[in-house]
């Protein structure tokens, strides 16, 4: 008797992740998922009510990968905040399709998990700089918008700078904001 191949929800999410990473989310559909998994589309629809539900779960799956990535120290940065901002850019450079998927083409709003992650960063800024929470939030938003602009230019192939040059810009922006908020 032939052994039945079991396609799990996790297998399907991994396949979706790989399709986006390698080809972009415009190639993400049930047929391409089935092809990647070497099966029919039936296991996909057995695991997910529809492709919208799959897409929403895949966004969370990719976000978990992103959180793990930016939490690692890829750049030997001592400041948790600069580590995060630099890793955000590094993620965009290393995984442009995944970056686009979760930050540019994602119809789902910020999650509770993202809010917690951001709150931790803001708290660290507040503690390190001696800022109020409101000032730390402004500091975060100003530098994040700056970094996001650079990341978007990277993934859209508008900007092709070396990572060291980008990191220098981020550091200068960081120092400028520290000076600005110190004087307030």
Locate the predicted segments by residue.
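HTH DNA-binding helix-turn interface
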Residues: 21-25, 38, 45-56
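Amphipathic alpha-helical linker/stalk segments
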Residues: 56, 60-84, 121-127
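Alpha-helical DNA-contacting segments of helix-turn-helix folds
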Residues: 20, 53-62, 69, 102, ...
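Hydrophobic alpha-helical connector segments
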Residues: 70-97, 140-143
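Basic, helix-initiating cap at the start of DNA-binding domains
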Residues: 1-23, 27, 31-32, 53
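Amphipathic C-terminal alpha-helical segment
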Residues: 98-101, 144-163, 176-184
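Amphipathic alpha-helical packing segments from all-alpha helical-bundle domains
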Residues: 106-142, 168-179
């Amino acid at each position: 008797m032939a052994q039945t191949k079991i396609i799990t929800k996790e297998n399907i999410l991994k396949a979706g992740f790989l399709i986006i990473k390698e080809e972009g989310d415009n190639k993400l559909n049930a047929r391409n998922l089935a092809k990647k998994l070497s099966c029919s589309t039936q296991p996909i629809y057995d695991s997910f009510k529809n492709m919208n539900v799959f897409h929403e779960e895949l966004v969370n799956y990719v976000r978990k990968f992103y959180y793990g990535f930016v939490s690692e120290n890829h750049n030997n940065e001592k400041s948790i905040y600069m580590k995060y901002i630099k890793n955000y850019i590094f993620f965009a450079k290393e995984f442009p399709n995944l970056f686009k998927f979760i930050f540019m083409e994602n119809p789902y709003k910020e999650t509770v998990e993202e809010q917690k992650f951001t709150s931790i960063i803001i708290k660290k800024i507040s503690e390190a700089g001696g800022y109020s929470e409101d000032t730390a939030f402004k500091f975060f938003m100003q530098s994040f918008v700056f970094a996001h602009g650079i990341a978007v230019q990277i993934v859209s192939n508008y900007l092709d700078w070396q990572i060291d040059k980008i990191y220098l810009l981020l550091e200068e922006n960081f120092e400028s904001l520290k000076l600005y908020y110190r004087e307030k």
